[in-house]
Amino acid sequence: MFTYKDVIFEGTQPQIDEKVYFAKGARIVGRVTIGEYSSIWHNVVLRGDVNSISIGRYTNIQDNSVVHVADNYSTKIGDFVTVGHNATVHACTVEDHCLIGMGSVVLDGAVIGRGSI
């Protein structure tokens, strides 16, 4: 049904709503949860290997972006969020209704507040 390649990491498989869209080349590894009607675009990497990634509903992660975690920080992306092309979202929190611009880098421990651009 999906067009993505999911990878089990240390016995943990991604949990993905059936209404999520995956473009060709997207890669999902480990402890990743994605809410309904979200979209993961071409060549995105979601790497929940050493901690977890949670992506809310109606969120889109655009082409060539990377979402990763750290040992001491998970990554949480809320509902109705856009992560622009070529962005890196690493071990941080992005609250609901945010826009992370193309090429942006958000690093460990950062909190992007609700409605931020």
Report each predicted region and the residues it spans:
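Terminal amphipathic alpha-helical/low-complexity segments used for targeting or macromolecular assembly
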Residues: M1-K19, G25, R31
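Catalytic donor-sugar/metal-binding loop of nucleotide-sugar-dependent glycosyltransferases
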Residues: Y73
